[in-house]
Amino acid sequence: MRATAHYPRTADQLSAARAFVRDTLASWGCRERIDDAVLLVSELFTNAILHGAGRVDLRMELVDARLTVEVVDAGRGPPVSLGPDPGIEATTGRGLLIVDKLAERWGDGHDQHGRTHMWVEVANP
């Protein structure tokens, strides 16, 4: 199963992206992973808002009980990596640490048009 949505790259679209994930997974019968998937999309979508360019595409695919979620934007930033823990007082900088803990696998890359792709993969129990 596949689903795709497109959003302007603005903070007010984050709630629509979360609702899309929630509704899509519920319709696919994947209720056990909705909370994790919504949090993962929140982190990736927020990174696209802060560091990307152009519209944001949200793609979801469920194959053999494995959910892949991808957030794509027109930003041409360098590949991302985990940085050090920002510390207890920091108000930012934890997004990829959260992604790393919740996702079984995750990564990023650029397509032939230079668009940035961030993806996560989780199993649906």
Where do the protein language model's features map onto the residues?
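Short, small-hydrophobic-rich alpha-helical interface motif
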Residues: 43-44, 48
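A short, structure-level motif marking secondary-structure boundaries and short turns
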Residues: 5-7, 29-31, 81
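Conserved short strand/loop->alpha-helix "switch" segment adjacent to the catalytic nucleotide/phosphoryl-transfer site
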Residues: 15-42, 90
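STAS-typified acidic loop motif
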Residues: 3-18
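Conserved beta-strand-loop-beta-strand hairpin that lines the nucleotide-binding pocket
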Residues: 1-4, 49-125
